[in-house]
Amino acid sequence: MPNDIRVLLLGGTGRTGGRVLARLLERGVEVRAIVRSARRLEPGTANDTRLTAVEADPLSLPRDELLELVRGCDAVVSCLGHNTDLGGIFGPPRDLVARMTRRACGAVAVLRPAEPVKFVLMSSVSVNRPDRLDTRRGAIERAAVALLRGLVPPAKDNQDAADFLCSEIGQADRFVRWVAVRPDTLVEGDGSGYALHEGLVSSLARPDKTSMANVARFMCELVTDPRAWDEWAGRMPVIVDAAVSV
Ligand SMILES: NC(=O)c1ccc[n+]([C@@H]2O[C@H](COP(=O)([O-])OP(=O)(O)OC[C@H]3O[C@@H](n4cnc5c(N)ncnc54)[C@H](OP(=O)(O)O)[C@@H]3O)[C@@H](O)[C@H]2O)c1
């Protein structure tokens, strides 16, 4: 079990982020979590001695404080997402995920770590890979997704965050390496097994299911298993539930 890995977790009070937090702690990882309210942490994790929870709005956390939280971390994991009420979907901050991705990567760049820091982003199958690499998505579906982005701010936010990683961090950054994990429709369930794909496998009209437990498990693998990291770094894997464990 890794006992010398340190992670900054964003969105650790969320449905998937809470599961990521539990899995990381189970694996002996030291976690720093920026949360708006520590009361929203699962009771089983809130008192874990390996967890440091900082109560703050991550977007307005002063830069120096963010730097101190990022300093010494091997990875930053973001499970941020807009709350699903009207205010969360259409109100500010419309750029929650993208802006926090920029902030966290910017903090890493300021710190100039000797080894690149891993940035693991929870993304979505609604997010396209650049250069039309998702060949499964034809013109009609691309138009539907573009419309979705125009109408629903979180969809644009998720695309902007991934675009930032692909285009501005890219593949050769000295300080940040990244993976954007793309689940399909999130469901409950024990996450007994999952399949990973380079690109999209289902259409938006006939979506697959991805249990949050599986997303959490894979995000933790990326942080703790160098082979998983080497396989997926700089890529945007699609994760869906599978009958057979991987
Ligand atoms: N729903 C799906 O089927 C689906 C499929 C694929 C991908 N995704 C993506 O997966 C990601 C995570 O989904 P989820 O359902 O696990 O998320 P979730 O349960 O809604 O959790 C969202 C997290 O973001 C935080 N957050 C929300 N608004 C914030 C704000 N203004 N400032 C700071 N923190 C804020 C929440 O904090 P609080 O606890 O304080 O509210 C919570 O920790 C999202 O980006 C979503 O788009 C969703």
Q: What spans do the regions from the language model cover?
A:
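N-terminal Rossmann NAD(P)H-binding glycine-rich loop of SDR-like oxidoreductase domains
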Residues: 2-27
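NAD(P)H-binding glycine-rich loop region in Rossmannoid oxidoreductase-like domains
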Residues: 33, 39-103, 110
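Structural motif
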Residues: 6, 74-75, 118
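Glycine/proline-rich active-site loop of Rossmann-fold NAD(P)-dependent oxidoreductases
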Residues: 129-133, 190-195, 224-234
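Conserved beta-loop-beta element that borders a ligand/cofactor-binding pocket
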Residues: 162-188
